């Protein structure tokens, strides 16, 4: 009897494991969630993979974990005195390498998928048990890579990837601001209430208030020094301030409003605040300690600081936003996150089977109970988003996590025995802040400069 019960238990566990390897895993994850699309639930699961990598990276920065990692010979072979503070950064490099390799693999594997009938579409939306093992295996395998030049080379990959992710993050922020503005304006027009207009004005003034406060703090902490004139920092702050003013003026210019009625100060305030954040983030790692009010703080503070916390929170919020925002008319869709063949299907009303109706397939409509909570297939007419580009974005997000959690430090020497501020990191962030503003200004000017072209 015991053997029979044991066999039944094993069979039950095997069945449950097999279920997790199929497409039904997403629907099982959404058992307690409202009705959602299969494509959305899939992206949320991949976002959870990224969140897991972020959590693991934060954990390995903890002092207790560092002590355990110190026992791995090649990690601390030459670091000696500073190993206790460095090994955490090495671990983050390796965790994020495994994370990036996992998403890069799926980015290449899913390249060119345009139909849900493609066998690779089944891989994208299913086999979650195998993916979990592959995901964990990639992270563990990264710890067995010989040190050599790994840290130095991988840091430059991180700089490039972080720069690209900052630009993608800008597009997501612009789309978020447009959506926010359109939503509140629409509610104001529907209800006829001025409450929404007041809220819109308050949000805009609040954003600009943070911008002004941020600019003042930048001048106080990064330009005042008795030993140095800090001309470079003054130029960075002043130039970005001018760009913010230009963008704000253009956003409400009559010619721009005529061709782009959706533009407004709310969007400009969000982009301006993001520019101030990037400027602060860049100047915080200025190698000249005479012109860096946070120099001593960053040198003595191990692990995450306020800038890293803000960075990773903003990053993850934007990734989740990209996971649920797929309309082809949005900036997310124009970025490549939405499939053109699927755009018409997104505008049609999707009918969800009621209780008692027959489900179509494992990846079709999935009934989740009598309360109407279920995951339904929205990719019959084609894929709802670019699988490859979504994984590419997550790969860049992994590199951004790595650089943010390691404070954009530059390893000196192949043994990572010394850390220093990187002038390259400063210029990467400053250049990204300029490019962000220039891209936004171009989106305002282009419809007015080229009226014959469709920029809707």
Swiss-Prot record:
PANTHER family, alphabetized: SERINE INCORPORATOR, SERINE INCORPORATOR, ISOFORM F
Function: Enhances the incorporation of serine into phosphatidylserine and sphingolipids.
Membrane topology recorded in Swiss-Prot or TrEMBL: Multi-pass membrane protein
Pfam families referenced in this protein's UniProt entry, alphabetically: Serinc
Gene source species: Nematostella vectensis
Subcellular location: Endoplasmic reticulum membrane
TM region positions: 10-32, 44-64, 95-115, 126-146, 153-173, 195-215, 234-254, 265-285, 301-321, 383-403, 430-450
Family: Belongs to the TDE1 family.
InterPro entries: TDE1/TMS
A GO CC term assigned to this protein in UniProt: endoplasmic reticulum membrane
Name by which UniProt lists this protein: Probable serine incorporator
Keyword field contains Transmembrane helix: yes
Keywords: Endoplasmic reticulum, Lipid biosynthesis, Lipid metabolism, Membrane, Phospholipid biosynthesis, Phospholipid metabolism, Transmembrane, Transmembrane helix
GO biological process: phospholipid biosynthetic process
